[in-house]
Amino acid sequence: MRVLIVEDEWLVALEIQNVLEDLGHTVVAIAADARKAREAVAMGVDVALVDLNLRDGLTGPGIGAELVRSGATVMFMTANPGQLGAGVPGAIGVLPKPVEHEEVKQASIYLEAVRFGQAMPKPPSRLREFTH
């Protein structure tokens, strides 16, 4: 699975990348702002894990919506889930940070199943799924 990480905290992004790569996924890019995230779409993205508050401000919700429109499966990961209100149409949901390694693993398994129409595993327990 080709994953885009949209996260401006470098150490958090690297932790997520390590978990995903250990599971055999390819991290196509780590984007710390909207411009980098838009550039990464051209690399082919199956799934995006998107923070809300990035280097250029509260641009995560808009980037998530753009990624959904481009065909990516999107899950938000943020310390401020309330900022999403009812959610972003087409996105899977939001996982509150801090996120443990096991939650990243569960999230990736869940997102892969959603993306590729596989048997649905149990979602991460703290995932707030959007209903649209």
Residue ranges and their predicted role:
Residues 7, 78:
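Conserved acidic carboxylate
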Residues 97:
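A Lys-centered signature of the CheY-like receiver
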